[in-house]
Protein backbone atom coordinates (compact mmCIF):
# COMPACT_ATOMS: atom_id res chain seq x y z
CA UNK A 1 0.00 0.00 0.00
CA UNK A 2 1.20 3.50 -0.82
CA UNK A 3 -0.22 6.95 -0.08
CA UNK A 4 -0.63 10.01 -2.31
CA UNK A 5 -1.77 13.42 -1.05
CA UNK A 6 -2.92 15.92 -3.67
CA UNK A 7 -4.32 19.45 -3.63
CA UNK A 8 -6.43 20.35 -6.67
CA UNK A 9 -9.18 22.72 -5.64
CA UNK A 10 -12.32 21.83 -3.72
CA UNK A 11 -11.80 18.26 -2.55
CA UNK A 12 -15.37 16.97 -3.06
CA UNK A 13 -15.24 16.31 -6.83
CA UNK A 14 -11.70 14.94 -7.03
CA UNK A 15 -12.36 12.53 -4.16
CA UNK A 16 -15.14 10.85 -6.18
CA UNK A 17 -12.99 10.75 -9.35
CA UNK A 18 -9.99 9.22 -7.58
CA UNK A 19 -12.17 6.68 -5.75
CA UNK A 20 -13.19 5.21 -9.12
CA UNK A 21 -9.62 4.56 -10.27
CA UNK A 22 -8.66 0.90 -10.31
CA UNK A 23 -6.03 0.35 -7.63
CA UNK A 24 -7.21 3.14 -5.33
CA UNK A 25 -8.23 1.37 -2.13
CA UNK A 26 -9.43 4.30 -0.03
CA UNK A 27 -9.87 8.06 -0.27
CA UNK A 28 -10.06 10.67 2.46
CA UNK A 29 -10.34 14.44 2.19
CA UNK A 30 -8.39 16.70 4.47
CA UNK A 31 -6.13 19.69 4.89
CA UNK A 32 -2.37 19.80 4.42
CA UNK A 33 0.67 22.03 4.22
CA UNK A 34 -0.36 24.59 6.81
CA UNK A 35 1.10 25.95 9.99
CA UNK A 36 -0.74 23.75 12.51
CA UNK A 37 -1.39 20.02 12.89
CA UNK A 38 -5.13 20.40 13.39
CA UNK A 39 -7.46 22.80 11.66
CA UNK A 40 -11.14 23.16 10.80
CA UNK A 41 -12.81 23.91 7.48
CA UNK A 42 -13.88 27.30 8.82
CA UNK A 43 -10.27 28.14 9.73
CA UNK A 44 -8.93 26.97 6.36
CA UNK A 45 -11.47 29.18 4.56
CA UNK A 46 -9.93 32.29 6.15
CA UNK A 47 -6.79 31.67 4.04
CA UNK A 48 -4.74 32.37 7.19
CA UNK A 49 -3.66 28.79 8.00
CA UNK A 50 -1.72 28.06 4.78
CA UNK A 51 -3.49 24.70 4.44
CA UNK A 52 -4.66 23.31 1.11
CA UNK A 53 -7.76 21.19 0.64
CA UNK A 54 -6.42 17.77 -0.36
CA UNK A 55 -7.43 14.25 -1.28
CA UNK A 56 -5.45 11.49 0.41
CA UNK A 57 -5.34 8.22 -1.53
CA UNK A 58 -4.36 4.78 -0.31
CA UNK A 59 -3.45 2.83 -3.43
CA UNK A 60 -1.90 -0.45 -4.51
CA UNK A 61 1.24 0.34 -6.56
CA UNK A 62 1.03 -3.13 -8.14
CA UNK A 63 -2.22 -2.04 -9.80
CA UNK A 64 -1.67 1.70 -10.37
CA UNK A 65 1.59 3.61 -10.23
CA UNK A 66 2.20 6.91 -8.47
CA UNK A 67 3.05 8.41 -11.86
CA UNK A 68 -0.32 7.32 -13.31
CA UNK A 69 -2.08 8.86 -10.33
CA UNK A 70 -0.24 12.13 -10.96
CA UNK A 71 -1.08 12.05 -14.67
CA UNK A 72 -4.76 11.63 -13.72
CA UNK A 73 -4.35 14.49 -11.19
CA UNK A 74 -3.30 16.79 -14.04
CA UNK A 75 -6.17 15.58 -16.25
CA UNK A 76 -8.91 16.44 -13.75
CA UNK A 77 -7.98 19.99 -12.77
CA UNK A 78 -6.44 23.13 -14.26
CA UNK A 79 -2.79 23.32 -13.11
CA UNK A 80 -2.35 26.77 -14.64
CA UNK A 81 -4.61 28.76 -12.31
CA UNK A 82 -3.00 30.11 -9.16
CA UNK A 83 -4.97 29.52 -5.96
CA UNK A 84 -8.22 28.75 -7.73
CA UNK A 85 -10.21 26.05 -9.49
CA UNK A 86 -13.42 26.89 -11.30
CA UNK A 87 -15.54 29.22 -9.16
CA UNK A 88 -13.41 28.68 -6.02
CA UNK A 89 -10.71 31.18 -5.08
CA UNK A 90 -8.23 31.14 -2.19
CA UNK A 91 -4.91 29.59 -1.26
CA UNK A 92 -6.69 26.49 0.03
CA UNK A 93 -7.61 25.67 -3.59
CA UNK A 94 -4.03 25.64 -4.87
CA UNK A 95 -2.57 22.92 -7.08
CA UNK A 96 0.01 21.04 -5.01
CA UNK A 97 1.50 17.56 -4.78
CA UNK A 98 2.53 16.60 -1.25
CA UNK A 99 5.19 13.91 -1.47
CA UNK A 100 6.01 11.39 1.26
CA UNK A 101 9.41 10.16 0.05
CA UNK A 102 12.36 11.12 -2.13
CA UNK A 103 11.04 8.73 -4.79
CA UNK A 104 7.65 10.47 -4.83
CA UNK A 105 9.40 13.84 -4.98
CA UNK A 106 11.41 12.79 -8.05
CA UNK A 107 8.33 11.43 -9.80
CA UNK A 108 6.29 14.54 -8.95
CA UNK A 109 8.95 16.90 -10.26
CA UNK A 110 9.36 14.84 -13.43
CA UNK A 111 5.62 14.79 -14.15
CA UNK A 112 5.29 18.53 -13.40
CA UNK A 113 8.14 19.22 -15.84
CA UNK A 114 6.47 17.14 -18.60
CA UNK A 115 3.08 18.79 -18.10
CA UNK A 116 4.73 22.22 -17.99
CA UNK A 117 6.34 21.59 -21.39
CA UNK A 118 2.97 20.52 -22.80
CA UNK A 119 1.28 23.64 -21.41
CA UNK A 120 3.95 26.14 -22.54
CA UNK A 121 5.41 26.75 -19.10
CA UNK A 122 2.23 27.92 -17.42
CA UNK A 123 1.93 25.24 -14.71
CA UNK A 124 1.72 26.64 -11.17
CA UNK A 125 1.54 23.24 -9.41
CA UNK A 126 4.04 22.94 -6.57
CA UNK A 127 5.52 19.84 -5.00
CA UNK A 128 6.16 19.92 -1.25
CA UNK A 129 7.04 17.53 1.53
CA UNK A 130 3.91 16.35 3.34
CA UNK A 131 3.40 18.58 6.37
CA UNK A 132 0.60 18.85 8.93
CA UNK A 133 -2.03 16.66 7.28
CA UNK A 134 -5.32 16.31 9.13
CA UNK A 135 -8.57 14.74 7.94
CA UNK A 136 -11.47 17.04 7.13
CA UNK A 137 -14.65 16.88 9.16
CA UNK A 138 -16.84 13.81 8.65
CA UNK A 139 -19.50 15.73 6.70
CA UNK A 140 -16.89 16.42 3.98
CA UNK A 141 -15.98 12.74 3.54
CA UNK A 142 -17.65 11.30 0.40
CA UNK A 143 -19.72 14.51 0.40
CA UNK A 144 -21.06 14.23 -3.14
CA UNK A 145 -22.13 10.62 -2.60
CA UNK A 146 -24.26 11.73 0.37
CA UNK A 147 -26.15 14.40 -1.59
Swiss-Prot record:
GO molecular function terms listed in the Swiss-Prot or TrEMBL record: L-methionine:thioredoxin-disulfide S-oxidoreductase activity; peptide-methionine (S)-S-oxide reductase activity
Catalysed reaction, written as an equation: L-methionyl-[protein] + [thioredoxin]-disulfide + H2O = L-methionyl-(S)-S-oxide-[protein] + [thioredoxin]-dithiol; [thioredoxin]-disulfide + L-methionine + H2O = L-methionine (S)-S-oxide + [thioredoxin]-dithiol
Gene3D superfamilies: Peptide methionine sulphoxide reductase MsrA
Active site as annotated: 10
Sorted UniProt keywords: Oxidoreductase
GO biological process, one term: protein modification process
Alphabetical list of InterPro entries matching this protein: Met_Sox_Rdtase_MsrA_dom, Met_Sox_Rdtase_MsrA_sf
Alphabetized SUPFAM superfamilies for the sequence: Peptide methionine sulfoxide reductase (SSF55068)
Pfam entry (one): PMSR
Known EC number: 1.8.4.11
Function: Has an important function as a repair enzyme for proteins that have been inactivated by oxidation. Catalyzes the reversible oxidation-reduction of methionine sulfoxide in proteins to methionine.
PANTHER family linked to this entry: PEPTIDE METHIONINE SULFOXIDE REDUCTASE, PEPTIDE METHIONINE SULFOXIDE REDUCTASE MSRA 2
Protein family per UniProt: Belongs to the MsrA Met sulfoxide reductase family.
UniProt-recorded name of the protein: Peptide methionine sulfoxide reductase MsrA
Source organism: Pelagibacter ubique (strain HTCC1062)
Gene: msrA
Amino acid sequence: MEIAVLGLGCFWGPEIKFSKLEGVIKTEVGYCGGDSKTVTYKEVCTCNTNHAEVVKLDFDPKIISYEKILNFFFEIHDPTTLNSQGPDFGTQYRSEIFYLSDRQKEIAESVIKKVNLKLSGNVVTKSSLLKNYCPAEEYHQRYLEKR
